[in-house]
């Protein structure tokens, strides 16, 4: 059994900070305390990739001298010689420092450095007697003094909220956190490349909207001082992107932030990243095929495979995604129902009441059969959709921007994609009939007046754009944060957002 020292107390930390501030004061007295004239020419990962396979004889013959810089994470002083571990943006490399090479003054200065300091090393690459690749320091400099001590290696950043609040410390201390955000970057890069390869134009649309639209959500409200008008942080870019389709861009996409003034949960953050794309002359069937491949390619870009492990269960994105209607999903995943029961509004309403839903309040009080079936699906089946599954054929009353089916009354050409019981994407054949769209906006206004805070506003300019004519179009939005959760085996959306929102510190 190994004994571990207790975690440092606040008093200990304050004492260490005071000692480090005193060291910094002495540095200021002797010259430039924070120099900015060192440029590294190598990174730890590159050195390991190039030289781990060579023995000392080959390294001596190669006579490779490098300049590296990074944070000192470990330090072992053994009289006239010392070892340190340097961590840069790519990984870690061992540093060997000795008094005979550095000189008395430089070696004495090194001994005063602290864990967390940013240092610069120049010297040859070699291997120790134990075979560890290292850099033998011919020169060593302190570039940036760390005033706050890092968490010790054993205790690390144990407080989950502290990891979110001080993500910079989490990134320093936790390899898994760095890998998560590297994977996120690769996933977004893979999505962007897939879109560009498919002929889509990347665009940027406003973040401040005079009318919130494009989704059913409660917006953040602000004020534009120069124009003296109320504005809203966007809840979705949809209506602006479709204006671009009207304008003649046939394929557009945007990766950017949305803001919804709603709750926080492991799946929800008020500020989140979406990728929305729109393609002229495409319908929702084409969208499902394209979205399936897009997500598969993002997984491969981020992890190297389309077969993943999420929360100790296999998640296979390599196979065709399932497609079910709302009722088919209920019958498959929620036991005990018949189609006849699902077709009875009174029965569905009674079932929702049993499940604790407020069927007397908005929006269910005014809901038709389709909306009631959707609510029952959300209560009984949604969380069970582990396999990638498209739920299709949503009712018109909950899909105010989607094209109605030509063959089924009250149904739209819309889908939502669920993976591991979470909504990942939402898409549909777009409604391009301006008169139908205006009528649906009016119905949304009535719902808002009846107490539905998430109902949409009437956007007259969007109707005007449609009146110029929009080609048949398909559009889809993908939640980047939720997708990255899957790709990185992260249980909470906060784990994949660098700086999630938290309550103010006391």
Swiss-Prot record:
Q: Which cofactor does the UniProt annotation name?
A: Mg(2+)
Question: What's a Pfam family in this record?
Answer: tRNA-synt_2
- Record EC number: 6.1.1.6
Alphabetic keyword roster: Aminoacyl-tRNA synthetase, ATP-binding, Cytoplasm, Ligase, Magnesium, Metal-binding, Nucleotide-binding, Protein biosynthesis
Q: What's an example GO cellular component term for this entry?
A: cytosol
Asked if the keyword Ribonucleoprotein belongs to this entry, the reply reads no
Asked if the Swiss-Prot or TrEMBL record annotates the protein with the keyword Repeat, the reply is no
Residues annotated for Mg(2+) 2 binding in this entry: 423
As for subcellular location, the record says: Cytoplasm
User: PROSITE patterns from the entry?
Assistant: AA_TRNA_LIGASE_II (PS50862)
Tell me one GO biological process term: lysyl-tRNA aminoacylation
**Which Cys-Cys disulfides exist here?**
none
Q: Which residues bind Mg(2+) 1?
A: 416, 423
Write down the chemical reaction(s) this protein catalyses.
tRNA(Lys) + L-lysine + ATP = L-lysyl-tRNA(Lys) + AMP + diphosphate
Cofactor remark from the record: Binds 3 Mg(2+) ions per subunit.
Question: Which GO molecular function entries does the Swiss-Prot or TrEMBL record give?
Answer: ATP binding; lysine-tRNA ligase activity; magnesium ion binding; tRNA binding
Q: Which family does it belong to?
A: Belongs to the class-II aminoacyl-tRNA synthetase family.
Subunit (UniProt): Homodimer.
Name of the protein described by the UniProt record:
Lysine--tRNA ligase
* Lineage of the species this protein comes from: Bacteria, Pseudomonadati, Pseudomonadota, Betaproteobacteria, Burkholderiales
- This protein's gene is called lysS
């Amino acid at each position: 059994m190994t004994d571990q020292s207790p975690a440092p107390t606040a008093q200990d930390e304050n004492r260490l900070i005071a000692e480090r501030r005193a060291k910094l004061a002495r540095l200021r007295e002797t010259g430039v305390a924070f120099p900015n004239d060192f440029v590294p020419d190598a990174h730890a990962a590159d050195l390991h990739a190039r030289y781990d396979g060579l023995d000392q004889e080959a390294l001596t013959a190669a006579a490779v001298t490098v300049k590296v810089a990074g944070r000192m994470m470990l330090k072992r002083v053994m009289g006239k010689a010392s070892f340190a571990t340097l961590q840069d943006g790519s990984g870690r490399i061992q540093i060997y420092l000795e008094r005979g090479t550095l000189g008395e003054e430089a070696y004495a200065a090194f001994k005063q450095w602290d864990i967390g300091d940013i240092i610069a090393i120049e010297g040859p690459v070699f291997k120790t007697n134990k075979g560890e690749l290292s850099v033998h320091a011919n020169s060593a400099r302190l570039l940036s003094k760390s005033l706050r001590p890092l968490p010790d290696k054993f205790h690390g950043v144990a407080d989950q909220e502290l990891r979110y609040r001080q993500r910079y410390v989490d990134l320093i201390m936790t390899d898994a956190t760095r890998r998560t955000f590297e994977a996120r970057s690769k996933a977004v890069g893979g999505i962007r490349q897939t879109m560009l390869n498919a002929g889509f134009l990347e665009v940027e649309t406003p973040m401040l909207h005079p009318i919130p639209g494009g989704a059913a959500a409660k917006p953040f409200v602000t004020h534009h001082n120069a124009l003296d008008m109320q504005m809203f942080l966007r809840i979705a870019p949809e209506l602006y992107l479709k204006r671009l389709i009207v304008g003649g861009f046939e394929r557009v996409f945007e990766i950017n932030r949305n803001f919804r003034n709603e709750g926080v949960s492991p799946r929800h953050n008020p500020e989140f990243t979406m990728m929305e794309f729109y393609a002229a002359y495409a319908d929702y069937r084409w969208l499902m095929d394209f979205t399936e491949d897009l997500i598969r390619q993002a997984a491969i870009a981020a992890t190297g495979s389309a077969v993943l492990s999420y929360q100790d269960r296999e998640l296979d994105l390599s196979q065709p995604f399932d497609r079910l209607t709302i009722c088919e999903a209920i019958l498959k995943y929620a036991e005990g129902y018949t189609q006849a029961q699902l077709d009875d509004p009174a029965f569905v309403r009674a079932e929702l009441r049993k499940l604790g839903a407020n069927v007397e309040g908005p929006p269910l009080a005014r809901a038709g059969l389709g909306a009631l079936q959707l609510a029952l699906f959300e209560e009984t089946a949604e969380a069970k959709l582990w396999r990638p599954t498209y739920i299709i054929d949503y009712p018109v009353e909950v899909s105010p921007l989607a094209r109605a089916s030509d063959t089924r009354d009250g149904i739209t050409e819309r889908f939502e994609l669920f993976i591991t019981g979470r909504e990942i994407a939402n898409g549909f054949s777009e409604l391009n009939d301006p008169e139908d769209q205006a009528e649906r906006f009016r119905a949304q206004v009535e719902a808002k007046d009846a107490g539905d805070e998430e109902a949409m506003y009437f956007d007259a300019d969007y109707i005007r754009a449609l009146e110029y004519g929009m080609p048949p179009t398909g559009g889809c939005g993908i939640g980047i944060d939720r997708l990255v959760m899957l790709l990185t085996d992260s249980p909470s959306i906060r784990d994949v957002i660098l700086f999630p929102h938290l309550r103010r510190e006391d």
